[in-house]
UniProtKB/Swiss-Prot annotation:
Pfam family, one: Ribosomal_S13
Keyword Membrane assigned: no
Any single GO BP term: translation
Organism: Cyanidium caldarium
Role according to the record: Located at the top of the head of the 30S subunit, it contacts several helices of the 16S rRNA.
Subunit structure: Part of the 30S ribosomal subunit.
Cross-referenced Gene3D superfamilies: 1.10.8.50, 30s ribosomal protein s13, domain 2 (4.10.910.10)
Protein name (database record): Small ribosomal subunit protein uS13c
GO molecular function ontology, one term from the record: structural constituent of ribosome
Family: Belongs to the universal ribosomal protein uS13 family.
Subcellular location(s) per record: Plastid, Chloroplast
Keyword vocabulary terms for this entry: Chloroplast, Plastid, Ribonucleoprotein, Ribosomal protein, RNA-binding, rRNA-binding
Encoding gene per record: rps13
Domain of life per record: Eukaryota
Length: 122
């Protein structure tokens, strides 16, 4: 298997699809990388040459923040928002939607499972 940015890529997939397995690289960015390095999109990972793999690995490490570094960066940004006591930080702290979504209904993903209060035992 090919390891790029600490992530093993599936060998039977096309290169542009396989690069999406790296956190921080989506479809658009993977195609942009391959265009820059002049690698054919339809090439399978197992058919890549050693030089192409090295070029892709070096290009990603040099130009993008990916995988654990990106996760750490995002986590530190959220912690900073909580520390400075901003509105977004408060919403993160209370585990509520951050970007202005309504919470009276339709916030189950963020708020968790609905708890039904049993009033019979009171």
């Amino acid at each position: 298997m090919v390891r790029i940015a600490g992530r093993e890529l599936p060998t039977n997939k096309r290169v542009d699809i396989a690069l999406n397995y790296i956190y921080g690289i989506g479809p658009w960015r993977s195609r942009q990388i391959l265009k820059e390095l002049k690698v054919d999109f339809s090439t399978r990972v197992k058919d890549l040459l050693v030089g192409e793999i090295a070029a892709i690995r070096e290009y990603i490490e040099r130009n993008y923040v990916v995988e654990s570094d990106l996760r750490r960066f995002e986590l530190l940004n959220i912690k900073r928002l909580i520390e400075i006591n901003s509105y977004k930080g408060k919403r993160h702290k209370m585990l509520l939607p951050v970007r202005g979504q309504r919470t009276r209904t339709n916030a189950r993903t963020r708020r968790g499972v609905k708890r039904i209060i049993d009033l019979k035992g009171v």
